[in-house]
């Protein structure tokens, strides 16, 4: 029998035993102490978080986690501002960028699953300053999402129980989510798994309804197909509307990259991460493109309900059901949005708290945020990040509501910053890999279309970060202009500050001196026969990187 090491070589167990080295995976040999061996330890040795997420958790977290209130409610605002064509273009183009980013994540995180994801890798392969900019931009993105979802959740419950004030619902659920997150990552993964299935089923049900509705099979209504693309039209505000929709779409795609963070707490990142990455195109087509097509087909962009004050009523799903003649459908949609809100808050707390934990381990945040209890739960980081969500209470006051809306809208440019850093870091890792004489064949996962995917993503994210506030130029809107661009100068100042006061230089790391084996590990539950067969199967990277794009498409569903 043979066992697998990091270089995918085989060694004889008997020979290994003579050398007094414990094999990782062998059914007839005593198991290694999982707390002593860093490769298969139950806890990440660099951050202390527990490795409890299963393959199915990671897979459904990536697939169902992107179906949030933004897609169900916020996309209606995007439809109103841009029209169905703008929505389709926005989801398609941002989807191409998201696909490129996920290919980069697949290569980076499968190679280096330990230690904290892309912020840690940005420090190792660039400097101390880059992860600060990327990490805090990521915190801002999910802080904005968290505050918005607390407010959305409370608004939904007020739809049914208006006698309870908005702040009452916010405080009740603040404590509930705090307690839930402190239980542990295993419960988080299991809960998100089942919530993801509910969201997928709900979205597919809406697609089926849409097909029946536009085909004229509801209450003998005539078929109208894509009539709303002609009247009132495909675009509501021309190119300006398209520019606005791009910012919306970038926010809706945020969280796609969270697989990189979850890998640190995954039992088997070598299997889970590639599986999640291969599902990216599936997510883009079924979730985002599907939403763009069916929203544009069932709801005209000038429907007055898209600007309704009640979040439930301005959901395109609720509007379509109401237009079909089912007035009580708003309650069903309300329940569906409630499920997505619970999942979105849960996911935002997880992503934001782990990002703070990793920043603290890099010396870029207070050390207390790096502390985890004996169960691997980063209690201080969870509590601090959850406390940031209380800014949603500002929306209770009429005077503070405008300030609240500006804060929530910060998330758009933050996504472009994070994605740009991920793509740049991928280029640096590959450059270091080649500079030290490593073979591309050694990579456990090779990004499709490299180097075009990271280069395209980097260029596109820089471009979109610079033009995403274009709609506020004429007529000039000072408040929204500052809101659109404030993170860019703040990020530059943060970068300079870290270089001056922490690093004492502006140099980047020497790629030839980096330890390329640091941060690599084996899967905890890898089975020898599975590992050997996977190396010979069509899912391995030897076949994957030599396959055509159509071969790649066929592997997405396996």
From Swiss-Prot:
Extracellular side of membrane: 79-81, 148-168, 215-241, 302-324, 397-402, 468-480
GO molecular function: amino acid transmembrane transporter activity
Keyword line: Amino-acid transport, Membrane, Transmembrane, Transmembrane helix, Transport
Cytoplasmic side: 1-57, 103-126, 190-193, 263-280, 346-375, 424-446, 502-558
InterPro entries per the UniProt record, alphabetical: AA-permease/SLC12A_dom, Amino_acid_permease_CS, APC_YAT
Pfam family, one: AA_permease
Top-level taxon: Eukaryota
Any GO CC annotation of this UniProt entry: membrane
Annotated membrane topology: Multi-pass membrane protein
An annotated GO BP: amino acid transport
Assigned protein family: Belongs to the amino acid-polyamine-organocation (APC) superfamily. YAT (TC 2.A.3.10) family.
Role summary: General amino acid permease with broad substrate specificity.
PANTHER family xref list: AMINO ACID PERMEASE, GENERAL AMINO ACID PERMEASE AGP3
Identification of the protein by name: General amino acid permease AGP3
Source organism per UniProt: Saccharomyces cerevisiae (strain ATCC 204508 / S288c)
Lineage of origin: Eukaryota, Fungi, Dikarya, Ascomycota, Saccharomycotina
């Amino acid at each position: 029998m043979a066992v697998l090491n990091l270089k995918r070589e085989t060694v004889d167990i008997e020979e290994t035993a003579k050398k007094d080295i414990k094999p990782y995976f062998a059914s007839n040999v005593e198991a290694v102490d999982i707390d002593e061996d860093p490769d298969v330890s139950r806890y990440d040795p660099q951050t202390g978080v527990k490795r409890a997420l299963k393959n199915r958790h990671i897979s459904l977290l990536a697939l169902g986690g992107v179906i949030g209130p933004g897609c169900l409610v916020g996309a209606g605002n995007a439809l109103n501002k841009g029209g169905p064509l703008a929505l389709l273009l926005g989801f398609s183009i941002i989807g191409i960028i998201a696909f490129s980013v996920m290919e980069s994540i697949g290569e980076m995180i499968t190679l280096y699953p330990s230690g904290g994801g892309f912020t840690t890798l940005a420090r190792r392969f660039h400097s101390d300053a880059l992860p600060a900019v990327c990490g805090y931009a990521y915190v801002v993105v999910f802080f904005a999402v968290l505050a918005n979802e607390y407010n959305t959740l409370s608004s939904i419950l007020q739809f049914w129980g208006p006698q309870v004030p908005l702040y009452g619902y916010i405080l009740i659920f603040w404590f509930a989510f705090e307690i839930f997150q402190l239980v542990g990552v295993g419960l988080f993964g299991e809960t998100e798994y089942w919530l993801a299935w509910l969201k997928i089923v709900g979205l597919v049900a809406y697609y089926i309804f849409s097909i029946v509705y536009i085909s004229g099979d509801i209450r003998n209504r005539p078929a109208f197909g894509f009539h709303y693309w002609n009247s009132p039209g495909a675009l509501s505000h021309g190119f300006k509307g398209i520019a606005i929709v791009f910012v919306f779409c970038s926010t809706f795609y945020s969280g796609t990259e969270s697989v990189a963070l979850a890998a640190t707490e995954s039992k088997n990142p070598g299997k889970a991460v590639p599986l999640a990455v291969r599902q990216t195109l599936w997510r883009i087509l079924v979730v985002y493109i599907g939403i763009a097509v069916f929203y544009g087909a069932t709801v005209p962009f000038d429907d007055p309900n898209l600007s309704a004050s009640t979040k439930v009523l301005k959901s395109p799903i609720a509007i379509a059901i109401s237009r079909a003649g089912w007035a009580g459908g708003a309650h069903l949609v309300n329940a569906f949005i409630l499920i997505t809100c619970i999942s979105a808050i849960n996911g935002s707390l997880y992503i934001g708290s782990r990002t703070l934990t990793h920043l603290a381990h890099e010396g870029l945040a207070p050390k207390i945020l790096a502390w985890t209890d004996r169960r691997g739960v980063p209690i201080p980081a969870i509590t601090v990040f959850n406390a940031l969500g209380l800014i949603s209470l500002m929306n209770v006051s009429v005077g503070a509501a405008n300030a609240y809306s500006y804060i929530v809208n910060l998330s758009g440019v933050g996504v472009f910053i994070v994605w740009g850093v991920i793509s740049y870091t991928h280029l640096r890792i590959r450059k270091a890999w080649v500079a030290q004489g490593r073979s591309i064949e050694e990579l456990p996962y090779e990004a499709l279309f490299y180097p075009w995917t990271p280069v395209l993503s980097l260029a596109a994210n820089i471009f979109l970060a610079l033009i995403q506030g274009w709609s506020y130029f004429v007529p000039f809107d000072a408040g929204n202009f500052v809101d659109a661009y404030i993170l860019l100068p703040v990020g530059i100042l943060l970068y300079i500050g870290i270089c001056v006061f922490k690093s004492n230089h502006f140099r980047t790391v020497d790629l030839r001196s980096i330890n390329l084996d640091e941060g690599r590990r084996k899967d905890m539950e890898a089975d020898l026969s599975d590992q050997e067969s996977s190396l010979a199967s069509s899912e391995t990277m030897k076949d994957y990187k030599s396959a055509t794009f159509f071969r790649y498409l066929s592997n997405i569903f396996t």
